[in-house]
């Protein structure tokens, strides 16, 4: 339509994308690549769940999930199981859960940028460092194995 009307075409879309929500891969990534549209991945840490700070039912006092408890997309049993599996995978490979989650997103061919949301300097540093990591084939296979057992628990 943009071509026919002489308008600028879309060059990016902003969709949720994380280890817990990979629905973008189902059709959208292929179309986006074909059309030259990049993904600005938002909520890459799944509201903080993929950082590991909510493991074992923890609820830090100032966390968004604690302050806004009605946001339960990531607190269902399937998401909690997958989150724990990803955290354990990260630990087995000497990574933090945050590093695993962000490095995975960085390595997807259709992602052009990732929207991060740090609330302090330490989080910002960890987020930035994660983009310097290239996950090994072994780690990527581990991620895929978890995804196959529990695909998209928080779409």
Give the location of each predicted region.
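Beta/alpha (TIM)-barrel catalytic core signal, keyed to glycine-rich beta->alpha loops juxtaposed to Asp/Glu
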Residues: 1-145
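Substrate/cofactor-recognition hotspot
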Residues: 153
